[in-house]
Each structure stands twice: as structure tokens, then as C-alpha cells.
């Protein structure tokens, strides 16, 4: 499918997300010999519409195509990567890009328009059109928040997981850094909120889907992560939601909250400051399975204690649970409705630089905004410091075709 960079704001995320990639262009079946002639690990093309005649093949990027320029008509992607067919030389993207999905078996074929001038191979679909990671900008806070900042520069950071299982560190200046080369799709929960290991650096906690183990990845203070350490031996798949919270127990150490699937109970796991968790304490007797998002957002109401933001699935309402010593105070309505249109919630501290904790969200397909709509709009809701939020600000539209934000 031809995808134009000029379409994004309203439709590009949706269009790309629905592309079947490499299964398009039905027509007369090409000669089987032509398909089987394409070696494993190669992308192949023919000048004919039925895959016969002289074959072009490559397993590396081609900035120019020589005599094959603007001649591809039928193609096979016999690789495990996405293949980007660019209308211009040198992988330029202003005109259009045809995207062909991985087909390691090499049995699928299709048609492309005879306008291809360069070919590139990438691990994820979005990299045919955009960088592997989205844009992220944050203002410099007046003081360190103690969380949401992996490199201690007082700019809120984001971790992004892509569909290839890589982990990217976004430092708040629009740039990105690869901090996890592979394997992160094996984690079905990733959370962070401050220092759990006692070295004054923010850490990352991950739950391993296959084992239910909880792992601590110590922050290096630069955005990268150290060697993981076992934090919970097993059983964590029994929890429907896990949130790194900050200090709820009142001992100055970061804690973890978890909702038990079978009971809907909310448990507090106090941090020890040494990378482990203490004996759990019940802080919510029931009903927490009714919440479809939990965010340790820092001090939202200005009382000096960390608070919890929760989304109620049945109503789309957003609730603030004020932190007390080892418990929560009475909840306060923070957002009346519509919050089910958000895919992800991020509590990163002060994003806008006004000294108040803010809330960041990433939208679902149902979102309709002023300048952005659909999947992958990134919004900032500035905190007022009294438990309320100001109107949203649409700050980016390229947070789509990824696999999680933390």
C-alpha cells in the first residue's frame, strides 16, 4: 500500500495500522519458478506484472537502483524485515513509500507502482516513514522531582518500546537513544517511579510474561540501564495492574502498588531501598479491577505527598486518590468523562516547567482533537497543583505503531 507522508494528522496512523503489507496487489499468479527463485533473506522484484522475466534481488539497502529505477511491478519480500520502497533516491520520504511486511516463507507476492528509486530494510513498519521513536520535548523543571528523570537533567523522560522489542530512551529534547536492543516484548508490565535500589537514580521494574517474575533494572543515571536483578520470584502474573508509585508508606522509599486479578484488592508493596520489596499490605479491599489505568503521578494536590490517578473503566472518569501515610484519602473526581479514549497514561512529574506535576497521555483511535486525531496523539494535561488539570495541549502526533510508553 502506498503511504504518503503528507497525509498525517488525521489519517496516516490509521492507514498504516490497517495496511496488510505485502498481501496487496492481487492478480494473475506469477510463475512459481519466479517466486522460488527469490532466495531466503532477499527482497526480489520483476519488471513484469506476473513475476516473470529477469529478477532483481537485494538483502541490503539500495540508495539508487540504476537500470532498475522506476521499473518494479511485482515483488516478493522473502525476509524477516519490513521493506520500504521509496519513490526517490537515498531513501527520501516526501513523496511516498510502499511498505512490504516480513514474509520469511517467501510465498506471498504483490504489485507495486513502477516509481521505486531506492530500497531500505527496517525492523518496524513505522521506520519506513518516521524515526523508530516519537518526538518528545519537556521543559526543564526548577527542581528535581525524584522520578520521571532517568538522566538527572531535570527534564522529564520517556521510555518507548517498539514492535521489534527494542527499548528507547527519550530525554526530552526530541532525541532518542537505544537502551534495550531486544527482548522487551517479553515483558507484560513496565513501570518506573524513582529510586528502588538506593543509589539515587531512577530504576525500571519489569514483569516477565513467561514466568511472572518481577525484575529490577537499575538506572545508570544516563538513561541506560544496568544488569537486571530479581525483585519478585514469581506469582506477579496474578496481578492485573502494577504501578510504581513513589513513597506511600511514609519511610522515604519508593513503593509498588498492584491489583490482584481474582479479588480486585489493591496491595502496597513497600520498597526497602535495596532493590527488593517488603511484606505487602492491603490498602484497597475490593473494586480495583474496575480501574483500567493506575498512574503514580507524584504530588498532584500540593500537600507534599505522592498521589494516585486511576481511570474507571465503566464511566471513563478519572479519579485522584490523595496519598496519606500508608493509605489513600477519599478520592476526588479529576476528569468527568472521555478518558477511555486514552491508550496510555504517564506520570512524569513536571513536564511544563512550572513546578507542578503534570499528566501525559497517548490517544486511541477514537480521539478527535483540534490538530490531531486518532491513534498516537500525545497530549499534556498541565497540573494546577490543587488536584485539578488544565486543558489538554496536543504536542505531537507520531506516537503510533509502537508497543508501549513508560
Predicted regions and their residues:
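Trp/Gly-enriched beta-strand/coil motifs that build multi-repeat beta-propeller-like domains
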Residues: 36-406
Amino acid at each position: 500500500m502506498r503511504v504518503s507522508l503528507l497525509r498525517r494528522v488525521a489519517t496516516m496512523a490509521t492507514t498504516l495500522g490497517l495496511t496488510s503489507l505485502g498481501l496487496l496487489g492481487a492478480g494473475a499468479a506469477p510463475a512459481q519458478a519466479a517466486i522460488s527463485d527469490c532466495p531466503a533473506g532477499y527482497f526480489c522484484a520483476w519488471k513484469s506484472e506476473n513475476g516473470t522475466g529477469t529478477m532483481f534481488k537485494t538483502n541490503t539497502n539500495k540508495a539508487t537502483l540504476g537500470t532498475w529505477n522506476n521499473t518494479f511491478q511485482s515483488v516478493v519480500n522473502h525476509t524477516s524485515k519490513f521493506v520500504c520502497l521509496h519513490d526517490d533516491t537515498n531513501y527520501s520520504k516526501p513523496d511516498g513509500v510502499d511498505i512490504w511486511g516480513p514474509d520469511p516463507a517467501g510465498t506471498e507476492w504483490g504489485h507495486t507502482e513502477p516509481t521505486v528509486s531506492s530500497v531500505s530494510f527496517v525492523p518496524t513498519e513505522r521506520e519506513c516513514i518516521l524515526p523508530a521513536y516519537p518526538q518528545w520535548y519537556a521543559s526543564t523543571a526548577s527542581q528535581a522531582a525524584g522520578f520521571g528523570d532517568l538522566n538527572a537533567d531535570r527534564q522529564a523522560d520517556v521510555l518507548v518500546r517498539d514492535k521489534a522489542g527494542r527499548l528507547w530512551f527519550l530525554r526530552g529534547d526530541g532525541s532518542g537513544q537505544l537502551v534495550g536492543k531486544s527482548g522487551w516484548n517479553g515483558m507484560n508490565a513496565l513501570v518506573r517511579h524513582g529510586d528502588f535500589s538506593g543509589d539515587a537514580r531512577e530504576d525500571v521494574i519489569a514483569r516477565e510474561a513467561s514466568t511472572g517474575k518481577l525484575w529490577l533494572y537499575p538506572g545508570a543515571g544516563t538513561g541506560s540501564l544496568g544488569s537486571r536483578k530479581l525483585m519478585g520470584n514469581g506469582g506477579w502474573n496474578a496481578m492485573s495492574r502494577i504501578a510504581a508509585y513513589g513513597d506511600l508508606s511514609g519511610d522515604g522509599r519508593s513503593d509498588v502498588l498492584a491489583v490482584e486479578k481474582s479479588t480486585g484488592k489493591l496491595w502496597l508493596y513497600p520498597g526497602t531501598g535495596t532493590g527488593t520489596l517488603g511484606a505487602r499490605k492491603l490498602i484497597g479491599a475490593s473494586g480495583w479491577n474496575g480501574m483500567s489505568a493506575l498512574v503514580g503521578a507524584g504530588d498532584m494536590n500540593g500537600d507534599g505527598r505522592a498521589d494516585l490517578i486511576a481511570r474507571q473503566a465503566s464511566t471513563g472518569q478519572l479519579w485522584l486518590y490523595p496519598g496519606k501515610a500508608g493509605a489513600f484519602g477519599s478520592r476526588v473526581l479529576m476528569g468527568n468523562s472521555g478518558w477511555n479514549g486514552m491508550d496510555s497514561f504517564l506520570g512524569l512529574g513536571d513536564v511544563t516547567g512550572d513546578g507542578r506535576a503534570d499528566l501525559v497521555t497517548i490517544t486511541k483511535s477514537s480521539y478527535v482533537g483540534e490538530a490531531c486525531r486518532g491513534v498516537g496523539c500525545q497530549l499534556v494535561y498541565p497540573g494546577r497543583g490543587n488536584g485539578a488539570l488544565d486543558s489538554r495541549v496536543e504536542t505531537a502526533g507520531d506516537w503510533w505503531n509502537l508497543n508501549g510508553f513508560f
